[in-house]
Swiss-Prot record:
Function: Component of the MICOS complex, a large protein complex of the mitochondrial inner membrane that plays crucial roles in the maintenance of crista junctions, inner membrane architecture, and formation of contact sites to the outer membrane.
Pfam family, one: QIL1
Subunit note: Component of the mitochondrial contact site and cristae organizing system (MICOS) complex.
Primary localization: mitochondrion
Protein name per its UniProtKB record: MICOS complex subunit MIC13 homolog QIL1
Membrane topology summary: Single-pass membrane protein
GO biological process, one term: regulation of cristae formation
Subcellular location: Mitochondrion inner membrane
Length: 122
């Protein structure tokens, strides 16, 4: 247990150290340079794969577009989280009502179908 914790902690520390070293946590110019370097390194591999695929692969987004998309989806996530928190009492009330109704249905004795069609033959 302790060994597993130490291994996981070491992996997290190594990941943070490596990402700091390559510039992910640096200023925006450093991150832009890293993004463009990765993009240029992947370009030959992507071109080789494009020839083998039966469909066209879209281009990677530009840096400014990537920033916009990251901000947009982050903001959408925050808004949806707060919308869920705002609606939580309503959801909880509906859920509790549904549970109450279900237990009331279970508490009632089953209805016996009467009539000539349901009586056993003699």
């Amino acid at each position: 247990m302790v060994l597993g914790f130490l291994v996981r902690g070491g992996l997290v520390a190594a990941t943070v150290y490596y990402t700091q070293k390559v510039g992910i946590w640096g200023d925006s110019d450093q991150t832009d340079k890293l993004y463009n370097d990765i993009k240029s390194e992947l370009r030959p591999h992507v071109q080789k794969l494009e020839k083998q695929l039966p469909f066209e692969v879209p281009q990677l987004p530009k840096t400014g577009e990537m920033r916009f998309l990251a901000k947009h989806y982050y903001n959408e996530g925050v808004k949806n989280t707060f919308r869920f928190i705002h609606m939580l009492p309503c959801y909880a009330g509906r859920g509790l009502k549904k549970v109450k109704d279900t237990f009331q249905d279970f508490a009632q004795s089953p209805a016996i179908a009467g009539g000539a069609e349901s009586s056993p033959p003699k």
